[in-house]
Amino acid sequence: VKGVTNLNDAKEIIENDFSSVCNGGYLVVPARVLNAACYGVPQGRERVIFYGFKKSELTDEAKKQLSAKVISSEYDPYPIPTHYLSKKFCNENEIHYVNVKQAFYGLEEPKQSLDISQQKFSKAKFMGKHCQGQQEVKLEGIGPTIRSEHHGNIEFRRLSKEHGGIYIKELEEGNEERRLTVRECARIQTFPDDYEFIIPKKDGNSSVSASEAYKIIGNAVPPLLAFNIARRLQDNWTMYFGG
């Protein structure tokens, strides 16, 4: 998590520990904080990413480039951003961030949905906006960080007028105050809709509850961020390791 960069020398200690694996057989490039929103994830989720390369597998040029104080853009293993947080600074061919409204496109309300992950949501009551998880999501903005430890206090899809909700039209249409569903959290994390999070107990097999599903989603690296990391390595593979 990003907080590791705020601890005294923690990042450097971790980098040195990784480098010492297999008697110093790994080349570890300086860690970097990546914001998932810069890669098409509709969520402000920042994570520290470490890369370690087995020295014996790298080409001589790759070892030289990856050991440089400043790694060239060509050899840089970190993925190039695909989306930008400020529309003001986007070039013509660059894309603004994906917002929550776009992420929720096509989702029905829980009572109308046939998807069990869209039917289920935390019933924890509103506790006042001074507490964590008591805000409603901003549909035109980036989603909140989906947390694994939340004790039911998942952010709200919408609040009532009484609690300061701003989606008045939705409320007037009869939609209730409620927290984010499991599927909505999964959409914010960029999981595909065919990923089943809630599994009923059947034929003696173990089950997964809505509470457990929230935790699984919150613990995950957003799949779209992971994809961009992997694709960058794939694109540079021959350059790093030869033909």
Predicted regions and their residues:
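Class I S-adenosyl-L-methionine
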Residues: 1-140
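C-terminal target-recognition/interaction regions appended to catalytic cores
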Residues: 107-243
